[in-house]
Amino acid sequence: MTAPVERRVRVAAIQAEPVWNDLQGGVNKVISLLGDVGKEGANVVGFPEVFIPGYPWSIFTATPLDNAPFMEEYFHNSLAVDSDEMRRIQAAVKENGTFCVLGFSERYQGSLYISQVFINTDGQIVHHRRKTKPTHVERAYWGTGEGDSLKCVVDSPFGRIGGLNCWEHTQPLLRYYEYQQDVDIHVASWPVLWDRPESVGSRWPYFITGDMSSRLSQVMAFEGTCFVLVCTQVMSEENFDKNKVRDVEHIQGTGGGFSAIFGPGGEPIATMPSDKEGILYANVDVNDKLRAKQWLDVVGHYSRPDLLSLRVNTHPSKPVFFAEEPEK
């Protein structure tokens, strides 16, 4: 009889404050955090959404005209994939021997994208994807990902690693396609999102809270029978003015973090206070996913593809096509 072999992996979820609108400072902080997880022997680490150069809450709290100088600064402090800054991060990943999923605001030519790169232990970018649909007013500042960004899972020595950004987790079909890609460990990259004080009530939507976002991530762990690393930003009160949130009623003090690690049954493995910076660690057995799948496999034995199926277009759209040379 063949006994199952444990597949032990040490995972890490970042909860940290960005270096707001500071590309070099953000790169330095990522490198420092990679050093921390390397010392702790982490095999896989996830970072929050647009950790470089931070999530610009001012897009919600200021008019586009009032916010224009801030976003011009934001553009120039966003990170290009093909850049010396990214190569510094890749070198740090290699030095610390961890597989990294990094969330960042990507600058490409004249546009921005909400992006993730998957960097292996050799420091190579093995996948680069963009948020397929920026949320609400985000669409005024960031472009959309194309069909190639539907791929959100890559292989690694530590299992199959996946990742999505923020409200991509609300997209049932996108989640389903990730499950079909056989994800083992999923990085849920989120910005800073505060919970709603009782005194505010319905004046602030519950669906834009850390609590709701955490629940979405937990559902993905259960639904996809995978480990989920919830990685979030925090914002200190001293940075409220820079981010134009000082007068937002429900934002009360340093906080906005909700990092967590969930197991493939949806069970919480590790959590952290919302106002603290830190790194969550857990030693997990990737085979726990297979034990959970005995009960639930929504792309396998617990599916009905003869009744319900998903059509996927993974081909990237291009703004320019070249005609073939005419025959002479």
From Swiss-Prot:
<feature type="active site" description="Nucleophile">
    <location>
        <position position="166"/>
    </location>
</feature>
<dbReference type="InterPro" id="IPR003010">
    <property type="entry name" value="C-N_Hydrolase"/>
</dbReference>
<comment type="function">
    <text>Nitrilase that hydrolyzes preferentially 4-cyanopyridine. Is also able to hydrolyze some aliphatic nitriles, such as (R,S)-mandelonitrile.</text>
</comment>
<dbReference type="InterPro" id="IPR044149">
    <property type="entry name" value="Nitrilases_CHs"/>
</dbReference>
<dbReference type="GO" id="GO:0000257">
    <property type="term" value="F:nitrilase activity"/>
</dbReference>
<dbReference type="InterPro" id="IPR000132">
    <property type="entry name" value="Nitrilase/CN_hydratase_CS"/>
</dbReference>
<dbReference type="Pfam" id="PF00795">
    <property type="entry name" value="CN_hydrolase"/>
</dbReference>
<feature type="domain" description="CN hydrolase">
    <location>
        <begin position="9"/>
        <end position="286"/>
    </location>
</feature>
<feature type="active site">
    <location>
        <position position="131"/>
    </location>
</feature>
<dbReference type="InterPro" id="IPR036526">
    <property type="entry name" value="C-N_Hydrolase_sf"/>
</dbReference>
<comment type="similarity">
    <text>Belongs to the carbon-nitrogen hydrolase superfamily. Nitrilase family.</text>
</comment>
<feature type="active site" description="Proton acceptor">
    <location>
        <position position="49"/>
    </location>
</feature>
<keyword id="KW-0378">Hydrolase</keyword>
<dbReference type="GO" id="GO:0016836">
    <property type="term" value="F:hydro-lyase activity"/>
</dbReference>
<protein>
    <recommendedName>
        <fullName>Nitrilase</fullName>
        <ecNumber>3.5.5.1</ecNumber>
    </recommendedName>
</protein>
